[in-house]
Amino acid sequence: GASCRCDSDGPTSRGDTLTGTLWLIGRCPSGWHNCRGSGPFIGYCCKQ
């Protein structure tokens, strides 16, 4: 899937590392967690 920015990745700027995986269907899979707290966002940003 596509990469997405977790809250722990820091503020948005050039050269950010995107450690999350965008999950569009339902919630994060078992063993993963949503790593993005808030904001206008489609789907979930999941991380193992």
UniProtKB/Swiss-Prot annotation:
Any one cellular-component term (Gene Ontology): nematocyst
Q: Which UniProt keywords apply?
A: Cardiotoxin, Disulfide bond, Ion channel impairing toxin, Nematocyst, Neurotoxin, Secreted, Toxin, Voltage-gated sodium channel impairing toxin
Query: InterPro entries from the entry?
Result: Anenome_toxin (IPR000693), Myo_ane_neurotoxin_sf (IPR023355)
SUPFAM superfamilies on file: Defensin-like (SSF57392)
Q: One of this protein's GO BP terms?
A: regulation of signal transduction
Disulfide connectivity? C4-C45, C6-C35, C28-C46
Q: What Pfam families does the annotation carry?
A: Toxin_4
What is the stated purpose of this protein? Binds voltage-dependently at site 3 of sodium channels (Nav) and inhibits the inactivation of the activated channels, thereby blocking neuronal transmission. Has effect on SCN4A/SCN1B, and SCN5A/SCN1B, has no effect on SCN2A/SCN1B, and SCN10A/SCN1B. Possesses the highest efficacy for the insect sodium channel para/tipE. Also interacts with sodium channels in cardiac cells. Shows lethality to crabs.
Can you name this protein? Delta-actitoxin-Bgr2b
Q: What is the lineage of its organism?
A: Eukaryota, Metazoa, Cnidaria, Anthozoa, Hexacorallia
